[in-house]
């Protein structure tokens, strides 16, 4: 069963109402929930914490939750509304609760917790659509894509393979100073038809939709690594213009490797060979698996 998007979209955007509803065990679409020690419910949600390195205006409108697809603009077409506030640089979907466990209430210290819906109906449909597209069963992939469109759009509309292909073939490939939703698959782990083919365009559509629907859930890096997508670190000014491109994660950059847990490294297992780099501000970025825009 899919999420009741009408009921969810009617919930208050403030406090913990939407995040708590998102990870509710009563939701039949949530197949697996996971509670972890994490501050992401504050960093990636409606708190000033982490505001400098935020999911901000430029990436929101150029690449994901307010970007354009064959369906129109994501922030007006889809039932999942974008949270924004003129006092914060962040724009996001509200999904991850922030809970704090006090170990000493008087001292105000303890541990931050977050809860994630790590396996859902919508995620399953997106992954099956991708699997169909990779196996060459393009119409079956389109059918799954349209199943999501029927439940996720305010005014449901479905699309043919030709409509999807025509749209994405009409979009320029991403460059760091002219970002789009369409990325070069530089070194994918799969065998994919040439750029401009029906298969490649359909995969662009599926990855675009997944990036919108799963924003803030931690899955994007998997797509980045599997498809060999280059990521750039950019600076934006107060007018949301890209003022500088300061770094990149190329396909073979060792920083793309996920580091082993500290406890197993301490026990003697050799860590993955990652590197520390300096940004232009002179700050050390150690094990930077994700690179965010900096808003000055």
Model-inferred region functions:
Residues 49, 55, 59, 65, ...:
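Aromatic (Trp/Tyr) and acidic
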Residues 1-41, 69-296:
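Acidic/polar-rich alpha-helix caps and helix-coil junctions
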